[in-house]
Structure formats: C-alpha cells, structure tokens
Amino acid sequence: MYYDDGIPVFDSLDKLTKPNSMKVVSSDSSEKGDIVLEPLESGFALTLGNALRRVMLSSLIGSAVYGIKIDGITHEFTSIQGVREDVTDIVLNMGMLRCKLNGTSNKCLSLSAKGPCQVLAGMIETDDQCSIVNKDLLICTLGQDVELNMTIYVASGKGYLPVTKYKENEFLKPMNEQDLISFIPVNALYSPINRVSYRVENSRVGQVTDKDKLILSVETDGTISPSQAVDSAARILQEQLQPFISSDISYKKSQVSSPSGYKDLGYDPILLRKVDEMELSVRSHNCLKNENITYIGDLVQKTESEMLRTANFGRKSLNEIKAVLNNFGLSLGMDIPDWPPKDIDELARQHTDED
C-alpha cells in the first residue's frame, strides 16, 4: 500500500508502537470496569482516550421509556386515589427504568398491580425481546384494594430526548390523535453510559519508558458491560474514519524485493495465496470457508464489521487473522482495484510454482 506520493504506508506504520490487546480490569460490579491499553506512542493515549470518551457519552445505542399510559389518567399533572406518589413522580421514576431490547427497536410493555403493595420494575410483564435490568426500581406505592394498569412504551435510540421534543419520536407517528390524548411523555435517556473518565500513565517497552498507557474507567447502566461499551465506541470511530482510508490511500503492488518471476503476475503474490496457507485455527478457517473466502486478496477487502457479522466468528478469531495479515504487511478493509483478476486460479498456480 502506498500514499499518492509513492511513500509506502507500511514503512511508516511499522515505525509506530502498536498496542497489545486491551485488558479489562473489572471491579466488584459488572457495571464498572477499567479498560487498559498499552503501549501507545507518546500522545496517542490522550487522543484515543478523548475520542472514545466522547463517542461513548454521545453515540452509543441504548433503550429507554419514552412514554406511558395509565388507565383513567389523561395527563401527568394529577394524582391517583390511593397511590402515595402523584403521576409526576411516577413519570420521573419510569424515566429511571433501564431495560434492554433484543431483536426489536420498539416495544410496548404492560404493568398491572393491586394494592396494598410497592410496585417495582420487576413486576412489568416482559418477554424474550425485552429484559429489565433494575428490577428493584420503585415505581409507586399502592394502598388497600387500589388497582394500577399501565402501558409502557420502550424504544432504542441514542442520546437524550426530552419531553419537549417527544413528538419528534418516530415511534409516535402510527398513533392517532385519540391515542395521544392519554399518552404521557417521559424524558428518554437512551445512553447506556453513566460516566466515563480516562487517565494516561507511562508505559515501558524494553528500555524505552516514554510510551503511553491509556486507562478508561467506564460505568454503564447494566445493559452492556464496560468492555462492550469501548468496543462499540471503537467500531463507530472506525466506520467514521474508513472513508479517509479508502479515498486517500490506494493499494499498489508491493515493490519489495522478490523473485523476478513475480513481476508478471500483476498482483502482489501474497494476495494470490490461499487462506489455507495462513495456518489459522480450525474455527477461523471454517468461518472463512463458509463465507467463500479463498484467497488472501478476498480476505483483506473485508472490513472488521463484516467479519464479525460472520456466523461463529468472534473477536478472538478476528485478532488472530489481523495478526497474521499484519505479518504480511496487510490489513482488513483494504481497497484492491480490479480484484479478483481473470484466471486467478492460474495466477495462483504460477505463484506456487515460483515458490
């Protein structure tokens, strides 16, 4: 791979310190944890830490209650006979409900209770498409023989949608005016992140002690783990940066010294090798086979997100493949013009014969 001025990309990349796989240091709570990445070039920890923190706080997808309906109630500025909390307090409590949607972006839940009792979030009826995380959350307190029937509207989103903008919610569009009369909007905090901070410490590589160590302290709402939060933020950054890579850098045949017979192949001979030669684990090899990825040239054009969508293909397999490709001076997400070449099998045989 070359820059437009002919400078090999990998010549410059190889001079940078590459971090090891991230280390997760969990606390007693599954919602809190430290994510450690080292070693990094001096200054890189600050750059990466700030970017990851901002993305985690602003752009991760989560689920939240955006509205409720209570039988017999048309607005929140009222009270319910026999219920200790007024409707405004109930609305505020529902805004603190943390749930996780699976396989759907919008869900309608039901809650029915009869007093005397404390109505908790764990009493909400759910199915395999929705799970409640904070089941001990107090919603309200019912008196003797008081009944409460509530409909709860949950959706996936990002950021924060206040009640002043609730009509911008796309899931309200199917509702008619009659339905909206008794609909009580709730401030929807979709972000699954409670807080994120980072610090930079020194890291050592051999005798060099001026490298960086990045430590991200992440606290979530329990719907995702700290490591999942960092993983999602990194994927978002990767997708946003991908156009810069594909538009400014193009792949050209490597000019490293190699046998003269390779010059007639038209492609870097490494790309014509079959993935069988990469000596991957059985799981990784089978995943590539199932996706009809035969040559290394086929593989390097896949992005990380595409690979992770492959059945039975996880991050361990991804890291294995990235490490092997890195040894060849290659990476995932490369743009190779005119691939695959005509008569690729014949070209591959030529390469094998030259070997």
Swiss-Prot record:
InterPro entries: DNA-dir_RNA_pol_insert, DNA-dir_RNA_pol_RpoA/D/Rpb3, DNA-dir_RpoA, RBP11-like, RNAP_asu_C, RNApol_insert_sf. GO terms for biological process: DNA-templated transcription. CDD domains: RNAP_alpha_NTD. It catalyses: RNA(n) + a ribonucleoside 5'-triphosphate = RNA(n+1) + diphosphate. One of its GO terms (cellular component) is DNA-directed RNA polymerase complex. NCBIfam families: PRK05182.1-2, PRK05182.2-5, rpoA. This is DNA-directed RNA polymerase subunit alpha.
